[in-house]
Amino acid sequence: KARKPEWMRVPLDTGPTYREIKKTMRDLDLVTVCEEAGCPNISECWNDGTATFMVLGERCTRACGFCHVDTRKPAMADPDEPVRVAEAVERMGLTHAIVTMVARDDLADGGAQHVADTVQAIRARVPDCRVEVLVSDFKGDDASLQVVFDARPDVFNHNIETVARLQRAVRPSASYARSLSVLARAAQAGLVTKSSIIVGMGETDTEVVQTMADLAAIDCDIVTIGQYLRPTSHHLPVVTWWPPSVFGEWKQQGEAMGIDHVEASPLTRSSYHAREAADAAERG
């Protein structure tokens, strides 16, 4: 088993802001994907006063090979959750709130209305806060997507996750073409769009570049690229530890294709430097 390289080791700095956010989340019975997914940047983001809320529960109806989120049968959606998220955003003084979700294929609309309600609750309570959503593909359903589009999030994020060849192995319940279609429809609706590629699961450099080209072709504004970390021995193994220099090359190549902002480093995750990426996309 290849050892984790030095550049992937991050100290956990649980400063006062970090502790305050943790307390706010527990007080309001909210979940952060930062904790659920074991994100390596949790200290940096939380101490910077930003966090990603995960709505619709802690259990996902899909079982992607890279993901640490629980996959047992989900609970009922909590209708009060949007208001509690908005209260947390206000308490934390956020200027850029990120709302993500577990995939809820068990719900008729896939959870779209709940996400839209959360965006609207944040806007009502903290009008100056920018709101980014990171959503499932809603099985490509036009009506569900339109519900989210109509909430007019400042950034619409849907992750393609991996290159075309590895889709079936990495996320068997989704598809490359469907994810591109979802992002294209969001762009056509006039939203700033964003997607993420996880590397280290067996893709080649050429395939990563091709994936960026496919995202650029549908006018994706922001792309994040980060190194896969295996959450447990039951998940897909790490095939490659890509060195930091390669991420720098991908950033240059992606931005040369016309993507407004490529955030690429071994420790980058979807919401990493999200505020800065949104600023860059607005400047476009």
Positions of the model-derived regions?
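Core AdoMet radical
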Residues: H68-V85, R91-A184, K194-I198, I222-T224
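Short cysteine clusters
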Residues: C39, C60, C64-C67
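Glycine/Thr-rich phosphate-binding loops of Rossmann-like dinucleotide-binding domains
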Residues: A63, L107, L166, S233, ...
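Auxiliary Fe-S-binding modules of radical SAM enzymes
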Residues: K1-T52, L56, V83, E87-E90, ...
